[in-house]
């Protein structure tokens, strides 16, 4: 069946969205190679985040004689893939759930997929000696008030039912680890990996197979679906008979492919403090480096880094134009400083040095449009808030799916439900924003 010719205008492209500390701490990258002139390839992958990098790498590995083009509007590591909190999470992590877990069969499949992603990434990081502060130290969950403690108990119960190991922690143990007496209860799960996300993404981009060409700073203005498909940029055209969509939240604008109205572009936000002085680190105490997720999914993620900085991540907004406004960033900075001050009152002079927003993509039912959605058009978008793991495994598996390579993990990916339809506007915006406000209010001091 031949692809029906259609045009997909790309009206929403990655913006500045604040100053991302993860990216700003890296050295200057080598000069970018933008797309120029008329270029032809066997495959084109749109978006150089975790899904796109994994898809391009796997296509290059499996078809070394083919020409693979990977294209991104910005520098690798600048976009959403370099703007998260740096957790590769192995366990269920349903942001719409009260306690992250859901139906047991689905959770078990997701664990297999997440660990498949971690295994694949670990091999790449070791093989190419990618410097990204890779730490296999698991993750903590922390709770403050009764609502959060109940969520933590529900998470622990879910892990027990799944046969997953964990350690429950009391307030004294949490203070010994974090240096603060803010948390009343906690839990440690050993399987997660913590990384410097922008460093990891940049390292992945620098170690692609030789038959993969990376085009950066090349915003795609229009996509012509046909035979072949054509991507139009400011400086050229890129043609290929097959395309992998790995642009996550930015794919929500593609109504003709059935994605608009089913996946939602959301934003969450992070801040990094200045480095703590030696005196401040001594005052804080606790372990030198740790990472903590909130018991309530709407609460604050906190990481203490070995370089002396502390990362705060909280606040969700619905941004259908896939950009964060200056006003949103101003409000978020104030919210992050409040969250920091609540947790670390012994550090009254520590301020945020960087604050940024990052796009993520979710669906109402946690589903993803994984597979071939139009002849020669393959989708690896909508990671539902788990970009590092789901993005990585979605990208790897979509390449294998496109080439007819079967596996248990691919079967699990294909069992994911497709995204359900969203209500029409303005009901959608009203509903999403009121739900976010209600859930943040419920999170209370956990935020």
Predicted regions and their residues:
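Extreme N-terminal leader/targeting segments of oxidoreductases
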Residues: 1-43, 61-62, 66-67
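Active-site substrate-recognition segment that forms the wall
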Residues: 119, 127-135, 220-222, 236-375
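Active-site-proximal substrate-binding core of FAD-dependent oxidoreductases
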Residues: 362, 374, 401-435
């Amino acid at each position: 069946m031949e692809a029906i010719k259609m045009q997909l205008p790309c009206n929403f492209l990655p913006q500045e969205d604040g100053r991302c500390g993860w990216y700003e701490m890296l050295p200057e990258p080598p000069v970018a190679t933008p797309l120029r002139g008329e270029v032809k390839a066997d495959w084109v992958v749109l978006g150089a985040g975790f899904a796109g990098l994994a898809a391009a790498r796997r296509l290059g590995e499996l078809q070394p004689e083919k020409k693979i083009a990977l294209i991104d509007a910005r520098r690798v590591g600048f976009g959403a893939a370099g703007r998260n909190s740096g957790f590769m999470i192995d366990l269920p992590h349903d942001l719409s759930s009260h306690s992250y877990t859901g139906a047991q069969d689905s959770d078990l499949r997701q664990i297999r997929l997440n660990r498949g992603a971690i295994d694949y990434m670990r091999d790449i990081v070791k093989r190419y000696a990618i410097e990204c502060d890779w730490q296999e130290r698991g993750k903590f969950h922390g709770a403050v008030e009764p609502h959060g403690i109940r969520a933590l108990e529900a998470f622990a119960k879910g892990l027990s039912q799944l046969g997953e190991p964990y350690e429950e922690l009391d307030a004294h143990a949490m203070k010994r680890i974090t240096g603060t007496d803010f948390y009343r209860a906690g839990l440690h799960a050993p399987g997660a990996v913590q990384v410097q996300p922008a460093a990891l993404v940049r390292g992945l981009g620098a170690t692609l197979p030789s038959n993969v060409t990376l085009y950066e700073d090349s915003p795609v203005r229009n996509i012509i679906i046909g035979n072949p498909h054509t991507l139009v940029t400011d400086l050229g055209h890129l043609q290929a008979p097959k395309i992998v969509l790995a642009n996550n939240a930015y794919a929500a604008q593609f109504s003709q492919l059935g994605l608009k109205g089913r996946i939602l572009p959301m934003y969450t936000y992070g801040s990094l403090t200045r480095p703590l002085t030696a005196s401040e680190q001594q005052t804080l105490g606790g372990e030198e480096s740790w990472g903590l997720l909130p018991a309530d999914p709407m609460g604050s993620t906190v990481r203490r880094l070995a370089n002396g900085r502390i990362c705060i991540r909280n606040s969700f907004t619905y941004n259908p134009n896939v950009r964060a406004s200056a006003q949103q960033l101003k409000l978020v900075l104030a919210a992050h400083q409040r969250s920091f001050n609540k947790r670390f009152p012994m550090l009254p002079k520590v301020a945020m040095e960087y604050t940024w927003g990052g796009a993520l993509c979710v669906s109402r039912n946690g589903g993803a449009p994984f597979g071939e959605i139009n002849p020669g058009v393959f989708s690896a978008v909508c990671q539902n808030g788990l970009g590092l793991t789901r993005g990585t495994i979605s990208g790897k598996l979509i390449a294998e799916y496109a080439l007819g390579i079967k596996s248990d993990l691919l079967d699990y990916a294909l069992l994911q439900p497709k995204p359900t339809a969203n209500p029409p506007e303005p009901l959608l915006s009203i509903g999403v924003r009121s739900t976010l406000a209600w859930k943040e209010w419920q999170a209370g001091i956990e935020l």
